[in-house]
């Protein structure tokens, strides 16, 4: 197949199962994706070399002709985490060509989602002032499994005692509408949740952020944590009721993780080796989740 057949597109559930988007969402994303894709195709070759001056016209017998085929190719890869060899069989191209197209198209999708305003803030710094509508935030750490590193020292750093396997971590912050507004940089699986939190520069503008006991001990004034059971003692009924109420609010970030990991490329063990690409695919998965969330409220 060169693109998803029209008969499948007509069935909303089938389109969603292949791309994570319903048809109306897909068409809206395609409009902007096409603009950026055509612009990049006119300036650069598939290998990333700048084209010589002159008008560029895409050949109809090219591997992926038209923006619709390119978006289908990319969304299906992200949704199903397909082996590149299998993706090549589906789209009638070699594995090496699949790799070239992915490196070419991923930044195009990222640019489109950024222009639409669905990508989260990223890095070590978050300023809640830009999100003035949210009354409170929820923060948590998500882990993704990776292959065991050949380097023994790296193995120790990447081994998560909680998950009992090698992982990488990111801290995310959600607003009260379950929209993910911040994504931290990558951390090794050994890094404790509180250690990640303390490493970040967060300006919460006097708005509360709900945390779980993994962040116990943090000195952030806006942090709201559940009561911790004292050793050899029990929590009071009031403390249990407070913990239950906080858990009902904090569950929003877990729902957000579930929505992001609808894309299997951030759910399965990561085969991608480069840190930059590992971060990039999670950022785009969050962008697509925020896009779906806004359109389906």
What are these regions (language model features)?
Residues 1-62, 297:
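Charged, often Cys/His-bearing segments associated with DNA-binding zinc-finger transcription factors
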Residues 33-44, 81, 109, 260, ...:
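Short amphipathic alpha-helical segments enriched in hydrophobics
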Residues 61, 74-76, 158-162:
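Catalytic micro-motifs at enzyme active sites that drive phosphoryl/nucleotidyl and oxygen chemistry
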Residues 65-80:
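Short, amphipathic alpha-helical "recognition" segments used to contact nucleic acids or chromatin
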Residues 84-297:
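Short, well-ordered secondary-structure "scaffold" segments embedded in the functional core
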């Amino acid at each position: 197949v060169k693109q998803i057949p029209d008969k499948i597109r007509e069935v909303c559930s089938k389109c969603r199962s292949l791309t994570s988007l319903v048809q109306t969402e897909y068409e809206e994303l395609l409009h902007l994706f096409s603009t950026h894709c055509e612009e990049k195709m006119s300036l650069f070759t598939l290998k990333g070399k700048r084209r010589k001056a002159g008008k560029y016209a895409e050949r109809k017998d090219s591997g992926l002709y038209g923006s619709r085929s390119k978006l289908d190719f990319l969304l299906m890869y992200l949704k199903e985490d397909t082996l590149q060899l299998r993706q090549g069989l589906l789209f009638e191209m070699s594995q090496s060509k699949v790799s070239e197209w992915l490196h070419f198209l991923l930044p195009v999708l990222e640019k489109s989602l950024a222009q639409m305003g669905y990508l989260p803030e990223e890095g070590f710094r978050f300023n809640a002032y830009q999100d003035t509508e949210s009354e409170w935030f929820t923060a948590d750490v998500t882990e993704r499994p990776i292959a065991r590193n050949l380097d023994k020292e790296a193995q120790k750093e990447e081994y998560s005692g909680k998950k009992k396997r090698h992982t990488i971590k990111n801290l995310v912050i959600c607003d009260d509408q379950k929209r993910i507004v911040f994504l931290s940089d990558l951390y090794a699986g050994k890094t404790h949740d509180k250690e990640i939190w303390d490493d970040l520069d967060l300006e919460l503008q006097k708005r509360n952020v709900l945390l779980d006991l993994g962040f116990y001990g943090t000195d952030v004034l806006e942090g709201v944590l559940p009561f911790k059971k004292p050793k050899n003692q029990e929590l009071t009924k009031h403390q249990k009721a407070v913990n239950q109420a906080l858990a009902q609010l904090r569950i929003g970030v877990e729902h957000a993780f579930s929505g992001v990991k609808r894309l299997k490329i951030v759910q399965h063990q990561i085969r991608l080796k480069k840190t930059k690409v590992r971060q990039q695919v999670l950022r785009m998965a969050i962008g697509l989740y925020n896009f779906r969330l806004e359109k389906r409220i």
